[in-house]
């Protein structure tokens, strides 16, 4: 919990990031509740890999609602897994940063009362999987963000949405060699990427867990 001035609902003179990791590998963040942080619950930097964040809840952020605030679960690393996490009143609830090498997976995550889109908030964060990610009140964006944050341009390529929901799901492909896709997704759908079974259910329910079971067996 980040201690703040209770009389100021937009106080920022308190802790911004709860967990900030860099130069780290083979780590876990598990079953943590985060409250009142202005920036991130978990912020994984470029030199992080093979990190799992699971079963965490972040809510009641205290901050302004612009800039780089409330990027709640964000990775700039590679081979990171964020699963079964909940973010409330975040701006970018589940996000990847500038040129995150990937692959990075967000699996069975929920954004409640979201104030901004989830997806990559930086340029060319390739190899994202959004698998059963539900964003209440905002969007999931795989597209050209143009001048967002000083000229982000294309935010991702070779990425996939699988059974996701949101206000609007933007899924565009930069070109024929860098294709994004969306399968079994619900909401207002837009983009030139590959779409299958839109506003319908697909099997398996979770692509990530199906591949994990195939690789490791049901005990995984």
Where do the protein language model's features map onto the residues?
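Active-site-proximal segments of catalytic enzyme domains
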Residues: 7-9, 18, 58, 82
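Short acidic, glycine/proline-rich loop/turn micro-motifs
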Residues: 9, 64-66, 142-144
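Gly/Ser/Thr/Ala-enriched C-terminal appendages of enzymes
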Residues: 105-220
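Right-handed parallel beta-helix
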Residues: 1, 25-36, 47-63, 76-92, ...
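Short, recurring structural edge motifs at helix starts
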Residues: 16-19, 68-72, 93-95, 114-120, ...
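Extracellular beta-strand-rich solenoid/capping regions of secreted or surface-exposed proteins
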Residues: 10-24, 44
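Extracellular/periplasmic ectodomains of large secreted or surface enzymes and adhesion receptors
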Residues: 2-6
């Amino acid at each position: 919990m980040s201690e703040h001035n209770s009389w100021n609902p937009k106080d920022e003179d308190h802790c911004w990031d709860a967990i900030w990791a860099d130069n780290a590998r083979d780590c876990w963040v598990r079953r943590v509740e985060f409250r009142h942080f202005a920036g991130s619950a978990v912020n994984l930097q470029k030199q992080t890999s093979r990190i799992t964040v699971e079963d965490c809840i972040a809510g009641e952020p205290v901050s302004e609602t612009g800039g780089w605030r409330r990027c709640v679960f964000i990775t700039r690393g590679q081979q990171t897994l964020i699963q079964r996490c909940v973010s409330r009143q975040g701006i970018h609830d589940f996000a990847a940063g500038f040129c995150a090498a990937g692959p990075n997976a967000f699996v069975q995550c929920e954004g409640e009362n979201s104030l901004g889109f989830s997806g990559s908030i930086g340029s060319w964060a390739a190899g994202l999987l959004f698998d059963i990610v539900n964003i209440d009140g905002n969007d999931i964006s795989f597209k050209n963000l143009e001048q967002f944050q000083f000229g982000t341009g294309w935010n991702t390529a070779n990425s996939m949405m699988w059974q996701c929901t949101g206000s609007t799901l933007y899924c565009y492909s930069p070109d024929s060699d860098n294709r994004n896709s969306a399968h079994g997704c619900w909401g207002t759908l837009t983009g030139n990427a590959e779409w299958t079974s839109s506003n319908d259910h697909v099997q398996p329910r979770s692509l990530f867990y199906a591949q994990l079971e195939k690789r490791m067996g049901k005990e995984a």
